[in-house]
Design a protein with these regions (language model features):
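Short, glycine/charged-enriched secondary-structure capping and boundary segments
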Residues: 18-20, 43, 79-80
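Thiol-based oxidoreductase modules, predominantly thioredoxin-like and allied folds used
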Residues: 25-48
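A short, hydrophobic beta-strand/beta-hairpin element that forms part of a small beta-sheet core
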Residues: 61-73
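Thiol/disulfide oxidoreductase modules built on the thioredoxin-like
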Residues: 54-61
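C-terminal cap of thioredoxin/glutaredoxin-like
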Residues: 70-90, 94-96
Length: 97
């Protein structure tokens, strides 16, 4: 099962959530729903180099995908999901929302 870390207020996340809804191959984890989920995501974000560019440019790093082999990626394509069309994107400073 592929874990998908999201927040419903993130435009990119809502597109991914709509694509994987009711698909048993994906587990949606809302990082805003419980502190346990947030801690799990922050551990990944703090320790996996896949987030380096996202952090450098002020992005949160969601949606984030943890593949069945443990690989962490920010690419929906690598997780078997069609890439979202360009649209709104939120940065940590609130711009782009």
């Amino acid at each position: 099962m592929i874990k998908v870390f999201v927040m419903p207020t993130c435009p990119d996340c809502t597109k991914v959530m709509a694509q994987v809804k009711d698909n048993p191959e994906y587990q949606i984890i809302d990082i805003g729903a419980h502190v346990r989920n947030l801690k799990e995501f922050l551990y990944l974000r703090d320790n996996d180099p896949v987030f380096d560019a996202a952090k450098r440019y002020g992005f949160a790093g969601i949606p984030c995908f943890v593949l069945e082999d443990g690989t962490v990626t920010l690419s929906s394509l690598e997780a078997g999901i069609s890439p979202a069309r360009n649209g709104a994107s939120c940065r940590i400073d609130g711009s782009g929302c």
